[in-house]
């Protein structure tokens, strides 16, 4: 089974929902798709606010550029056209799926 390390950029309401889905449904996703997603990290400027879900230690970072280096798939949930665009272009330049 193919495994993909997934990095989330942006940890607001939608980012927290995606993280929760990946953390709690990875086995279901793997069974249905043949691809096992592993939440490898979450980048956001604010990593201290409680988002209502339990995130394993070491997954939160403020360094999105560094996170991009260590994942296979980047889920961009920052929004906008400036910072988000910068990270998307970086990820694509590194051959990541976005």
Annotate each PLM feature:
Residues 11:
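Glycine-rich Rossmann-fold phosphate-binding loop(s) that bind the pyrophosphate
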Residues 40, 58, 72:
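Conserved acidic residues
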Residues 63-73, 77-98:
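Rossmann-fold NAD(P) dinucleotide-binding segment
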Residues 24-53:
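NAD(P)-binding Rossmann-fold cofactor-contacting core
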Residues 2-4:
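Nucleotide donor/acceptor-binding cores
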Residues 6-8:
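Hydrophobic Val/Ile/Leu positions in short beta-strands of Rossmann-like dinucleotide-binding domains
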Residues 56-64:
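Glycine-rich, highly charged phosphate/nucleotide-binding loops
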Residues 15-16:
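N-terminal Rossmann-fold NAD(P) dinucleotide-binding loop
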């Amino acid at each position: 089974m193919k495994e993909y390390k997934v990095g989330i950029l942006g940890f607001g309401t939608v980012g927290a929902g995606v993280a929760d889905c990946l953390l709690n449904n990875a086995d279901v996703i793997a069974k249905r798709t043949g691809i096992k997603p592993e939440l490898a990290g979450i980048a956001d400027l604010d990593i201290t606010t409680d988002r209502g879900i339990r995130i394993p230690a070491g997954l939160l970072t403020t360094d999105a550029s560094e996170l991009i280096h260590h994942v296979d798939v980047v889920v961009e949930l920052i929004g906008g056209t400036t910072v988000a665009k910068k990270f998307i272009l970086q990820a694509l330049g590194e051959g990541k799926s976005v």
